[in-house]
Amino acid sequence: MQQHDSDSFWGGIVKAMGLVFGDIGTSPIYTLTVVFALTEPTMQNVFGILSLVFWTMTILVTAEYAWLAMRLGRKGEGGAIVLKEILARMIRPGRQLTFVVFLTYLGVSLLMGDGVITPAISILSAVEGMVLIPGLGGLHQSWLILIAAIIAVGLFVFQFKGTDKVAGAFGPIMVVWFASLALSGAVSVASHPTVLFAVSPHYALQFLLDNGLAGFIVLSEVILCATGGEALYADMGHLGRKPIVRAWYIVFWALYLNYLGQGAFIISHPGAKNYLFGMVQHQAPLLYIPFLILTILATIIASQAMISGVFSIVYQGITTRILPLLKVDYTSSHLKSQIYIGSVNWMLMIAVVVIMLVFQKSENLAAAYGLAVTGSMSITGIMMILILSRTTKAWKAVFAALITVVDLVFFTACLHKLPHGGYWSIILASVPFITILVWTKGQRALYRALRPLELDTFELAYEQIYAKGRNIPGTGLFFVKEYNVVPPYVVHCIIRSNIIYERNVFISIVRTDEPFGLVSELKTGIATGLDAFEIHAGYMEHLEIETLLQQHGIKEKVIFYGVEDISTPNPVWKLFATIKRQTPNFVQFNKLPASRLQGVVTRVEM
């Protein structure tokens, strides 16, 4: 699955620009415009904001993700679930592990909620640049929303075909985008070179001291420059750490040079409505339309990266059993990381269009943006402290703690957004969060309610029935959670109904706490005519069960699996039962041959 080792130095950097940096790379479209909608664009304030932008990107993206988090991968994979799996090995079961699991669920949910806001604000802000085209200045906002919605819907409709064929163009397009940002910024800085001094932290501190509470609240808009920074770590599995970090150093200076250029433009044109588009139009009116097209392409690529990221998170959630099984399609014949989850895709599409209609303008959308990002960054920081403090490099935990304090300061500043649209971040994140809680608790409660039988007890009755010699020719396959614990449906089939084959195989799939790795083992002679087939697979591995069975010489005549008919007065368990009914069962998820499947219903009281 991993192809990044063979990528060339520059090839890896170009790929990273296309796959990882779309979100943070499109932040200059709206960040300073939103900030100076709240703040008077005086020279002193411009210097203060530019300094805050520099240090926000340095601390929250470079230090937190590029330097610290990206060294905490598992077989090249990153993300909240990876951090949880690392900690699970370090912490004994108890309150602390429960806290870590809760943080993981929250972090995953916030990132998935972010998958709605990112495409909405990116595409809408790019389309709004059309009003600066001569003759389109009077274009009504409703037309801009319609155009943005059409682009978004087109992007989601295209998902089922996969991005394999066009993904090769993402990197080169983003290279042109970052080069354009850097060039435009450099030209503007040349007219006002004193803005280069804004890198000094003195200006950031002075701004915060001079503006007090208002300055603190401005941090909730400054954070927009770092949104998408978490993708460095979350997308590490696609390319590896080195290409992403190398690309980030180039992207960082391209972005900051553009922010400096916008700062210089603001000083000379404080009345401009959108600083990036205004700056480019002022510099090269003839190139404005090509630049606008490039901007829209960049936001589409940014949105695509976020959609693919959500698919990847959901797949991790499915295989680690924190989310229900969903239909997963593989859109690439050679890259198993290229997946499509239809139900998630259409839910995202509807949510993105609704968000566009609710907020109308990108500057309004900015009011909802930031809360989920800073929450996710804070959770990453807390988990890094817990991990690093338990390693031989415990001194790194001190740096992680300082960074986490900065994360929490930004998160606190973003809380003021709650009544101004920020509550949408909570609403969007609550959908996956509630689903995760209901599903995980429901699975545990269901397992207890099923009251499985110990293998030793089962064998006594099994041997008596098998010895009668009325066995069905061929091989019967029975799916179980663990081969030494027998579920009720197997007891019903074999013991009560005497459905017993010449060869009976219990098959169990165990997902390990590593992202990759696949080991299968056939244990023969557990009892007369009874074998166990165990598959140990990493939580990112795509399983081809039929192939594995053939490799071990198992030619099944029929495949049995359990179907639970849940009866409960509890509203939470009713929701769990509904989710279970509406989502694919285990055999459907693994695309086993329908002609050989036999579901056995077990009535369960929860």
UniProtKB/Swiss-Prot annotation:
InterPro entries: K+_transporter (IPR003855), K_trans_C (IPR053952), K_trans_N (IPR053951), Kup (IPR023051)
Function: Transport of potassium into the cell. Likely operates as a K(+):H(+) symporter.
Disulfide cysteine pairs (residue numbers): none
Membrane topology: Multi-pass membrane protein
Similarity annotation: Belongs to the HAK/KUP transporter (TC 2.A.72) family.
Chain segments annotated as transmembrane: 18-38, 46-66, 97-117, 138-158, 166-186, 212-232, 247-267, 287-307, 339-359, 368-388, 395-415, 418-438
Record keywords: Cell inner membrane, Cell membrane, Ion transport, Membrane, Potassium, Potassium transport, Symport, Transmembrane, Transmembrane helix, Transport
Gene Ontology annotations for the cellular component aspect, listed alphabetically: plasma membrane
Keyword Nucleotidyltransferase: no
GO molecular function annotations of the record: potassium ion transmembrane transporter activity; symporter activity
Protein name: Probable potassium transport system protein Kup
Entry's localization field: Cell inner membrane
Reactions performed catalytically: K(+)(in) + H(+)(in) = K(+)(out) + H(+)(out)
Annotated organism of origin: Trichlorobacter lovleyi (strain ATCC BAA-1151 / DSM 17278 / SZ) (Geobacter lovleyi)
One protein family per Pfam: K_trans_C
The keyword Isomerase is annotated on this UniProt entry: no
Major location (coarse): membrane
